[in-house]
């Protein structure tokens, strides 16, 4: 069965490493903060000026003065700091954020990402995504495998305006975990109950498949 958004975030949380600085983009990535493995200390940074972001608050505990870049209410951990956007982007552009988790509309087999504009639709701008993809050493994309029309978002080449080139290292979707290699998308894991054939059918790029593909463990 395909994963839901929370399960995608739960799987991505398994990629987090102890004592690292992580930025979570808008959408599915913001859910990752709810699934930190035990024994792992992570400093979550939000580009609107938060370092030490915690999980989402319980209903009734929301503080309207504490929000993430997607305007969602958040919690902060002990020792958290708040600062202006100039300081936030100095952290990002200075490569002090080691991992960025972003949503996307398309990802290509060479690691290009398109996640800020659909032609013909009004948008306010690309936000901080271009700074993030140009600065982080490790970028993981969290998204659905196909769009609402059933068209694959895993492509040989992006068709939408590009946010960054050759930057994505791994993609986690509702169907699969994919690693981007020099030769294209390598299938690492499949969602529970989803077959390799179903993943291939939903992918508009060639897949590197080596041996038996394990199911994700959540």
What is each stretch, according to the model?
Residues 1-77:
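N-terminal active-site beta-alpha-beta segment that forms phosphate/nucleotide-binding
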């Amino acid at each position: 069965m395909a994963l839901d958004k929370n399960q995608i975030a739960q799987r991505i949380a398994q990629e987090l490493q102890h004592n690292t600085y992580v930025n979570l983009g808008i959408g599915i990535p913001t859910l990752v903060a709810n699934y930190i493995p035990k024994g792992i200390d992570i400093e979550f940074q939000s580009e609107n000026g938060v370092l030490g972001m915690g999980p989402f608050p319980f209903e009734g505990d929301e503080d309207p003065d504490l929000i993430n870049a997607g305007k969602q209410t958040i919690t902060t951990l002990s020792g958290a700091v708040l600062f202006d956007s100039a300081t936030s982007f100095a952290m990002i552009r200075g490569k002090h954020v080691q991992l960025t988790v972003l949503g996307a509309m398309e990802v290509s087999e060479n690691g290009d990402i398109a996640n800020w504009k659909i032609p013909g639709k009004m948008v306010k701008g690309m936000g901080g995504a271009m700074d993030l993809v140009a600065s982080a050493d490790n970028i993981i994309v969290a998204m659905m495998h196909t769009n609402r029309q059933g068209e694959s978002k895993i492509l040989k080449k992006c068709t939408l305006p590009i946010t960054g080139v050759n930057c994505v290292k791994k993609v986690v979707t509702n169907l699969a975990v994919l690693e981007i290699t020099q030769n294209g998308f390598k299938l690492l894991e499949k969602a529970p109950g989803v077959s390799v054939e179903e993943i291939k059918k939903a992918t508009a790029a060639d897949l590197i498949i080596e041996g038996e593909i394990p199911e994700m463990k959540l």
